[in-house]
Regions:
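Glycine-rich, proline-tolerant flexible connector loops at the mouths of alpha/beta enzymes
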Residues: 43-66, 184-189, 250-253
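Alpha-helix-loop-beta-strand connector modules within alpha/beta enzyme cores
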Residues: 56-83, 139-142, 146, 204-215, ...
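N-terminal small/glycine-rich loop or linker at the start of catalytic domains
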Residues: 1-22, 112-126
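Catalytic alpha/beta core domains of metabolic enzymes, predominantly
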Residues: 107-247, 254
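Structured C-terminal cap/extension of enzyme domains
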Residues: 164-165, 231-289
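Active-site mouth loops of central-metabolism enzymes
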Residues: 13-32, 83-91, 128-133, 195, ...
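Conserved, mostly hydrophobic/aromatic
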Residues: 30, 37, 48, 108, ...
Length: 289
């Protein structure tokens, strides 16, 4: 039997309350949702704040407003933020240092590649997109912050080239300790749909073939879809992987809470025969510094 499964709850992202009223935005809401997710079985919570483009210290403090109440009750809780959407990689990651220096964050993030993101217009053609760009130098900066502050990188894999970049760092012995790669499959709804592979067994096989021989833990997520209903969560659990859920990614037929989405994966893990990792167990699985 495979070991404990790490469940990450991505609790808000750019999902609006109009789209789902259960989406937390303010720090007090973020704290409440995070506590509920940890109680339900999540080991990691990822969230955005309600402002972009702040200076690093201000952005860090806004995150900590939501994290401190949780860590008072759950000192084992694992959090990590998103980028700060600055004009360059230094500004976009300027909050990582202050968050690490607070002593309240053990994870960071890395997006090791570039990808077109956008939805489909009425004619079915891609429109209103952006190029989310991360050069190899940007990736080096992101990993450098992890090394400097002793943070485990949570690594987004939007396309196969992202994984090849990570593997180059791993083969060179330079991948920071505590890393996890997350295979982001593209769903069929929302601004983050339409990129990369769809959530199928064949697509996961392709990623796992690239990863063959590498011992870095991996997880699956479906952005603009439903990781549970798509079936890819079960396949991942059966193959020893981990799962990310949450209202940042969800675009199913209902308006669930983050807690309910975590419960779905917990039930699936029980059905597959895998225990659910606590935050402390997740830290050991990842080998966090």
């Amino acid at each position: 039997m495979a070991g404990p499964v790490i469940i990450e709850a991505a609790i808000n992202g750019v999902t609006s309350k109009k789209h789902n009223p259960n989406t937390p935005k303010e720090p007090a809401e973020i704290a409440d949702h995070a506590l509920r997710c940890f109680a339900a079985g999540a080991a990691v919570v990822h969230n955005h704040i309600d402002a972009f483009g702040l200076d690093g210290n201000s952005a860090a403090e806004r995150y900590l407003e939501g994290w401190r109440p949780v860590l008072e009750e759950r000192p084992d809780a694992l959090f990590y933020p998103t980028t700060n959407a600055g004009p360059d990689v230094v500004a976009s990651y300027a909050h990582i240092g202050p968050l690490a220096e607070s002593g309240l964050m053990r994870l960071s993030l890395c997006d090791p590649g570039s990808v077109n993101l956008g939805g489909l217009g009425p004619d079915g053609l891609p429109v209103s997109g952006i190029v989310y760009a991360n050069s190899f130098d940007d990736v080096a900066h992101q990993f450098g912050l992890c090394d400097r502050y002793g943070l485990g990188p949570s690594i987004a894999i939007y396309e196969p080239g992202f994984l090849r970049c990570v593997l180059a760092w791993w083969r060179a012995g330079r991948l920071p300790a505590g890393a996890m790669v997350k295979f982001y499959f593209g769903g069929d709804d929302g601004f983050l749909s339409g990129f990369g592979f769809q959530p199928t067994r064949t697509a996961l096989d392709a990623y796992l073939e690239l990863l063959d021989g590498c011992d870095v833990p991996w997880a699956v997520a479906v952005l603009g879809g439903d990781v549970h209903e798509s079936g890819i969560a079960r396949v991942a659990l059966e193959r020893g992987g981990h799962v990310r859920v949450g209202l940042e990614d969800y675009a199913g037929a209902h308006q669930p809470t983050n807690e309910e989405l975590v419960h779905d994966v917990v039930a699936l893990a029980e059905d597959v025969g895998r225990p659910v990792a606590t935050p402390d167990e997740a830290a050991k699985i990842l080998g966090l510094p």
